[in-house]
Amino acid sequence: HFDVDTIILDDGFQHLGLKRDTNILLFDHQRPFGNGQLFPAGELREPKREARRADLVCVTRYSGSNYPPGIGEQVSKGMPIVKSTLRLDSLLKLDSNEVLEAKNLRGQPVAAFCGIANPEDFRRILEQIRARVVDYHPFPDHHEYTSADLRAIEETARRVGAKYILTTEKDAVKLNPNSFSLPAYKVSLDMEILEGREVFNRHVLN
């Protein structure tokens, strides 16, 4: 019905019965194998040796240093590797989708909250645009917000003098757009390919 010609499936690598054209395997640059244990004892869905099935490896949250130990040993020789990071794309007001330019947050006191797997990533991105994070509340991943949570967020934000409340797109979809009386914005993030864009395009777009 929507004339779709490409389907991207999250967590599809370990679904061996799935017919696919390209296997893209993501490694977190900070913790590529977690604690090295398989689920439920660790974060791995399959043994590390199965990385050799990938057609392309994408190192996420790349910080400019060398690869962490182990990635090179687990992937096939000559496998293309792409390096990427997250960047702030836009800020949209929760109740109107009005756009706020990132430069307007420079030096401004903000309160932020999120319920994502790597909450420090969100804080780091806010600090990169020079926002002054005066309150930061990370909730558990996939957190379902209660009215008490939201009241506490706003009360703390007002107490510490925040002018804005910020959250992620992932969290914003769980909120009533009118949850806050302070100006509240959802932060849209974009993946930036630092190295290997041509390789990525060749595998994904061709």
Identify the role of each PLM range.
Residues 144-161, 170-172:
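A short, acidic, amphipathic alpha-helical segment used as a generic capping/interface helix at domain edges
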Residues 2-5, 157-163:
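Glycine-rich phosphate-binding loop signature in dinucleotide/nucleotide-binding domains
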Residues 89, 140-144, 180-206:
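Short, flexible loop segments at boundaries between secondary-structure elements
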Residues 63-71, 120-121, 172-176:
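Short, charged/polar "capping" segments at the starts of alpha-helices
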Residues 92, 96-98, 103-147, 201, ...:
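Redox- and metal-dependent alpha/beta enzyme cores, enriched for Fe-S-associated oxidoreductases
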Residues 1-77, 81-83:
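Phosphate/Mg2+-binding loops and adjacent switch elements
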Residues 18-19, 48-53, 74-77, 104-106, ...:
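Short, conserved loop/helix-junction motifs that constitute active-site signature segments
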Residues 27, 84, 137, 187:
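Hydrophobic residues at beta-strand termini and immediately following loops
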